[in-house]
Structures are given as structure tokens and as C-alpha cells.
Amino acid sequence: MSERRLLNAGGFAACAALLAYALYTQYYGGLEPCPLCIFQRIGIALLGVVFLAAALHHPRGRGRYLYALAIAIVALATLLVAARHVYVQSLPPGTLPSCGAPLSVLLKFTPLWEVVRKVLTGSGECAVVNWRFLGLSMPAWVLLWAFALGAAGVIANLRASSDDPQVMRRFADS
């Protein structure tokens, strides 16, 4: 198995583990996700799908650049949502609007772009920090993981592997 395929499969496994832990804390730990948490879960899930597609497809040549770009875009979007969440959690109490309607209600009665705008502005429920590990909240960990997975995915897919025909031609020409 090539190194790039293995790294993409590892990226998928890391995303799956992050989502599994998020679901564990929700259903067994009693932590209800706020709308920003749900957006971060969607981002990690999409990142996992891109990693899985890159591992299964494993394109040679220029095709790997498309996967590097897709990983970069999804990881950056997830990182930005997590950064917004960390910022919302750092604001002093009383500076955010009160908790609004649940995300399921917003999705049912509000246009999608308005839902995205409302979620990204944050609400009172997004400012609550009820979980920490090594002093960092869950959104801070998502921020770190999105950065690490995005960087690893981009580097792994930009770097030519030994099973790439272009690399083999370069070695044959020298």
C-alpha cells in the first residue's frame, strides 16, 4: 500500500474517531451540541469523506492535487467555524444574544443562508464551556485537529509517491 493512500486512510480514521467521540459525549456524556458544534461535526464528516475518497480513488499524477485542494478547503472551513466558536466562548457573559430557536426549527422555517448567518453569529448556548481536556474546550480541540488533518492531508497529497508514473520517469531519465 502506498504511503499517500495510507495517510489518507489515516485521515479518514481520525475523522471517524473524532465524530465517534463527539457522539459518545452527546449520548453517554449528556453534552448537547450547540449549532456551531453541529457545523463543526459536519465539517469533520466532510473532511473524512474527502480523505476516504482520496484513499479509495488514489489518483496518480495531477489528480492528487484536486484532493489536496478539497482537503484544504474543507479543513479551512471547519477551522474557521471552530475559531469562531472559540471566540464566542471567550466573550464576556451578556454580550451574546440569548439562545434562539433550535437548529432543527431554524432549518424547517428559515432559508438556508439565513440559518448559516444566524449560527455563525453565535448565541448564548454556544458560549457555554461545559467540557475541557488539558485546559482546552472541545471547539479548541476541533480547531487543532482541523489544522493538523488539513496540513497532513495537503502535504500527503501534494508529495509525489514512488508509485506515481511521473516519479518513475524522472528516475529512469537520470
Could you tell me what each predicted segment is?
Residues 20-24, 52, 129, 154:
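Alpha-helical transmembrane segments of multipass membrane proteins
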